Amino acid sequence: MKKIINAPENYVDEMLKGIYDAHGDQVKYVNGDLRCYCTAKKKDGKVAIITGGGTGHLPLFLGYVGEGLLDGCGVGGVFQSPSAEQIYNVSKEVEAGAGILYLYGNYTGDIMNFDMAAEMCEMDDIEPRSIVGADDVNSNANPDTRRGVAGIFFMYKCAGAKAAQGGTLDEVLAAAQKAKDNTRTVGFALTPCIIPEVGHPNFTL
């Protein structure tokens, strides 16, 4: 697979900087950290919705930060979770007095770091709630342990719309939960993945 990039080790940050340069009227990064994204304008009294995950599934995750969707996003390296501190910093930036809803995929690192960020928010008297996407029926027969991939978008949209209408944290969470409960996806690969910094396929087909 051919990739048009400069240095592989700079790929993620250069990509994020490019997106910011192209859409700086809609998004900004937090505390000078390119991997902490949020909307350019905060609406007081609105439930803040935050996601995050590893780079490599564009437009997930930062591509859905914007009006009527998400308020913020933590971005990790390729297939790496954002840190708890990054998620917390985004949370502090976008929190608007109505609580925070975390929506993210069912991956060990994401769960661990979002849980830690939630604990940090609670210490600041910010109320966090979480829903973990688990839509990919191809990854596991047990619904509780499935991956959360493409289907997470529907949680974004439903929760974002309810939050934009002025819904409470409970109402926004219920909208996201309904979307999760009614969404299934099937994930499959046609070619093996090549992580830029590794330079060769992760597996063979």
Where are these regions (language model features)?
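Internal, active-site/partner-interface "lid" segment
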Residues: 139-146, 156-205
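Gly/Ser/Thr-rich loops at beta-strand to alpha-helix junctions
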Residues: 54-59, 105-114, 147-152
